[in-house]
Regions:
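Secretory targeting and sorting signals
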Residues: 1-32
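N-terminal segment immediately downstream of the Sec signal-peptide cleavage site
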Residues: 32-98, 195-227
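Generic recognition of long tandem-repeat/solenoid scaffolds
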Residues: 53-54, 59-63, 144-158, 186-192
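Predominantly extracellular/secreted and cell-surface proteins with exposed
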Residues: 79-178
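Extracytosolic low-complexity repeat regions of secreted or lipid-anchored proteins
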Residues: 161-167, 173-203
Length: 227
């Protein structure tokens, strides 16, 4: 009886080891899947990197060698151009990806010393001011960016110009802005965002089309990625 039992015992142990060998590797991907599932929309350092914390302040200036433009038409080149501009946002929600992160845009500035105009009769640019802040900004996993003003208001911008007849203010409004976030350069780009003139002299063009690329978007010194 003992002689016949030993082989069965060895067979049982061998079968148990085989089952364990097949079972243990399957548990490893489960851990990896959980880690991927916990990745938020915004991270720093790399895709799937360190989560951006709620309350973190993100900033970005114009991409190197580019300018923010405010042209009279989507296909034209007449208008205002600035080589120095910056925005600042505070992160208010950063859910698990895929999803949509929410930010509060607290500042969007243009350095008037970097701005020029090629509009006939305009001698220079006194400044560009963004009104009705703060705006709500959303960034989705697919790269879609939407900038929305407070309820009942608009994205409002005043372009102050020096002319042959003195200083004039051209005031423009848009219901919202849409852009695209890219991990290539950690950028946010706005292309031909249409504004409508609500006040200003005849030297102010009827519509303004805003184009700019901001990069890199950073959290402190770390580049921000969209997941």
């Amino acid at each position: 009886m003992r002689t016949r039992t030993a082989p069965r015992t060895r067979q049982f142990l061998t079968l148990t080891a085989a089952v364990a060998a097949l079972t243990l590797p399957a548990a490893v991907p489960a851990v990896a899947d959980t880690a991927v599932a916990d990745t938020p929309v915004l991270t720093t350092g790399a895709t799937g990197g360190t989560p951006v914390a709620v309350g973190d302040v993100l900033t970005a200036s114009l991409a190197s060698g580019t300018a923010a433009t405010f042209h009279s038409s989507a296909t034209g080149s007449s208008g205002v151009s600035c080589t120095s501009s910056q925005f600042t946002v505070t992160v208010t929600d950063n859910p698990t990806a895929p999803g949509t992160a929410t930010e509060t845009l607290t500042a969007h500035t243009f350095d008037s010393g970097s701005c020029t105009s090629n509009v006939t009769g305009v001698l220079g640019v006194n400044g560009i001011t963004v009104h009705n802040l703060p705006y709500t900004t959303t960034v989705s996993s697919d790269g879609a960016v939407v900038v929305t003003p407070p309820s009942g208001s608009t994205v409002r911008t005043t372009v102050a110009l020096r002319t042959l007849l003195g200083s004039i203010n051209c005031v423009y409004e848009a219901p919202r802005l849409t852009g695209t976030a890219s991990n290539d350069g950690n950028s946010i780009a706005f292309t031909d965002q249409r504004f409508t003139k609500v006040s200003g002299s005849g030297l102010c063009f009827a519509n303004g089309y805003f184009t700019a690329t901001y990069a890199p978007v950073t959290d402190g010194t770390e580049a921000v990625y969209v997941n």
